[in-house]
C-alpha cells in the first residue's frame, strides 16, 4: 500500500515532545546495537527475536509489516527488507498520536501484508484476534492483571474470538448493513471503511496503544497511558480466596468496562455469586441492595451468558428506577452491548412480596415482558424481546424465551458508596484497601488491626 510520504511525516512528528522522540529512537538504537557489527537497520528475524519476550510472534510480524510500509523517502519505489529508525519513529507516532487516516494507512498494512487496497473480513478478524491476544499476553507477562485470575475465568481464547467478531461487526455495520457471521468474514473491507471504523470505534486504537506502550515499554509512564490502562481493565476485588469460576472472560471484562461511565471504570468488586452464596433470591437481594452501580450476569441452562448494567443502586420498589446509562449485554454465544433507545424509561426494576405486581428483578421492556428477568423464585427467568426490547433494542438474550438459571453473579463497579463506609467500615475495609486508606486519611484508625489474622487479600 506504501503509505505516507516524507512531507507529512514532519507534521506527524510535531505531535510528540523531544524527550518522547528520544525515548522511541533509543529503543530502536538499542536493538541495532545488539546485532553483530554496526548496523542502522533491522531485519524481520532479528526484530522478532528482539521482541520474543515482549510480544507474541504473530503480532511482531504484523508490527514489522506496518513499519516496513512507511515510506520516508518519496523517491524510493521499492520496499527494503530491513526497517530504519525513521520508519520505526513514524510508525510509532502515527499509531499513538495520528489521525484516523494516518492510523488506517499503517493498520491496513498490518492487516494485509500483500498491500491490497481491499481486504476481506476474515483478515480483519485475524488481525483483531492477534491484537487482543497480544494485549492479554503483555498484561499477564508484566503482572498488570489487577487482581483478575485467568484460572478462575472463562477461556480467554473464546473470549478473544468473540470480541474480535464483535468489533468486526461494527466495521461492517458502519454503512448501515448487518451481516451474519460468514457474510462478515467473506465481505470486502476497503481502506476508507477501515478509516471510518477506527474513527468511530476508539477501542481498536486503545488496544494498539496498550500493545505498543506496555509491550515495548515505550512511553508507558506518560499520563495518556495511565488513562488507557484505567479504561482498559478495572481493578478486581473479592475474587481471592474463592473457588468459583466467573462467567466472565478477560476480553468481556474489557468490553463491558469500555461501555461503563468513566467514573466507575477503575474498579470492580464481586458482590454475589450463586456458586458461593447459594441459589436464593433473598441472598441475591441482600448482597446487591444499596451497593451502587453494578453489573448483573446470568448463565442459563443452555449455556447462554447475558445480563445488564444498573447505573444506580438497586432498591426494592414498585416503580422502575435507573437512568439512560443503563444497558443490557450478551457475552455468549455473541458478545454485544445494547444501549438505551429513548422509547421509555423502564431501565431497571426490583420488587418482592407484592400481590398485584411482578416479583423479581428485571431490566427493559415492560411488566411480564422484560428484556431480561429473574423471577423471585430464582430458578427461572425470561427474555421476552421479540423482535427487540423497546428500552434497549436488544434481541432475546437467552436461548429460550423462558429459561432456567444455571448461575448468577453480580459485580459492583466504582468506589464503595460512602454510606456503606460510614455504616459498616469493618466489613468493607477487609476487602477494599483503598477504602481503608480513605478512612485512615480522615483520622479513623482501626484499633483491631493487630488482633486479627492477615489474609491474602490484605497482602495484595
From Swiss-Prot:
InterPro entries: TLDc_dom. It comes from the Eukaryota. It is found in: Membrane; Cytoplasm; Lysosome. Pfam families: TLD. One of its GO terms (biological process) is response to nutrient levels. Keywords: Cytoplasm, Lysosome, Membrane. Its main location: membrane. SMART domains: TLDc. GO terms for cellular component: cytoplasm; lysosomal membrane; membrane; nucleus. Residues 246-414 form the TLDc domain. Activates an alternative mTOR signaling to regulate cell proliferation and migration. This is MTOR-associated protein MEAK7.
Amino acid at each position: 500500500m506504501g503509505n505516507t510520504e516524507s512531507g507529512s511525516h514532519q507534521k506527524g512528528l510535531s505531535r510528540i515532545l523531544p524527550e518522547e522522540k528520544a525515548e522511541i529512537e533509543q529503543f530502536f538504537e538499542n536493538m541495532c546495537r545488539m546485532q553483530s557489527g554496526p548496523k542502522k537497520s533491522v531485519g524481520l528475524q532479528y526484530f522478532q527475536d528482539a521482541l520474543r519476550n515482549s510480544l507474541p510472534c504473530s503480532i511482531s510480524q504484523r508490527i514489522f509489516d506496518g513499519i516496513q510500509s512507511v515510506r520516508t523517502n518519496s523517491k524510493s519505489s521499492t520496499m527494503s527488507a530491513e526497517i530504519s529508525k525513521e520508519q520505526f519513529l513514524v510508525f510509532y507516532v502515527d499509531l499513538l498520536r495520528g489521525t484516523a487516516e494516518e492510523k488506517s494507512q499503517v493498520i491496513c498494512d498490518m492487516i494485509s501484508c500483500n498491500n491490497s487496497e481491499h481486504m476481506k473480513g476474515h483478515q480483519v478478524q485475524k488481525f483483531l484476534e492477534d491484537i487482543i491476544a497480544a494485549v492479554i499476553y503483555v498484561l499477564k507477562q508484566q503482572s498488570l492483571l489487577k487482581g483478575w485470575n485467568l484460572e478462575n475465568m472463562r477461556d480467554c481464547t473464546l473470549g478473544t474470538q468473540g470480541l474480535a467478531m464483535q468489533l468486526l461487526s461494527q466495521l461492517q455495520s458502519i454503512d448501515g448493513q448487518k451481516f451474519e457471521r460468514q457474510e462478515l468474514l467473506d465481505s470486502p473491507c476497503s481502506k476508507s471503511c477501515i478509516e471510518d471504523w477506527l474513527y468511530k470505534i476508539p477501542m481498536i486504537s486503545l488496544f494498539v496503544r496498550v500493545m505498543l506502550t506496555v509491550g515495548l515499554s515505550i512511553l508507558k509512564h506518560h499520563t495518556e497511558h495511565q488513562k488507557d490502562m484505567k479504561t482498559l481493565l478495572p481493578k478486581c476485588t473479592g475474587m481471592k480466596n474463592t473457588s468459583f469460576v466467573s462467567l466472565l472472560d478477560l476480553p468481556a471484562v474489557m468490553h463491558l468496562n469500555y461501555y461503563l461511565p468513566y467514573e466507575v471504570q477503575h474498579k470492580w468488586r464481586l458482590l454475589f455469586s450463586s456458586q458461593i452464596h447459594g441459589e436464593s433470591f433473598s441472598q441475591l437481594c441482600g448482597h446487591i441492595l444499596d451497593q451502587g452501580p453494578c453489573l448483573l450476569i446470568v448463565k442459563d441452562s443452555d449455556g447462554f451468558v447475558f445480563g445488564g448494567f444498573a447505573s444506580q443502586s438497586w432498591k426494592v420498589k414498585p416503580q422502575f428506577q435507573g437512568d439512560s446509562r443503563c444497558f443490557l449485554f450478551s457475552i455468549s454465544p455473541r458478545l454485544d452491548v445494547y444501549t438505551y433507545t429513548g422509547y421509555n424509561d423502564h431501565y431497571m426494576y426490583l420488587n418482592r412480596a407484592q400481590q398485584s405486581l411482578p416479583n423479581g428483578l428485571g431490566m427493559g421492556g415492560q411488566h411480564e415482558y422484560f428484556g431480561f428477568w429473574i423471577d423471585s423464585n430464582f430458578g427461572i427467568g425470561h427474555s421476552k424481546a421479540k423482535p427487540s426490547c423497546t428500552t434497549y433494542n436488544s434481541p432475546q438474550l437467552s436461548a429460550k424465551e423462558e429459561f432456567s438459571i444455571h448461575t448468577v453473579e453480580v459485580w459492583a463497579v466504582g468506589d464503595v458508596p460512602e454510606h456503606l463506609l460510614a455504616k459498616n467500615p469493618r466489613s468493607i475495609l477487609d476487602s477494599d484497601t483503598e477504602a481503608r486508606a480513605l478512612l485512615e486519611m480522615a483520622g479513623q484508625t482501626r484499633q483491631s488491626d493487630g488482633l486479627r489474622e492477615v489474609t491474602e487479600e490484605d497482602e495484595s
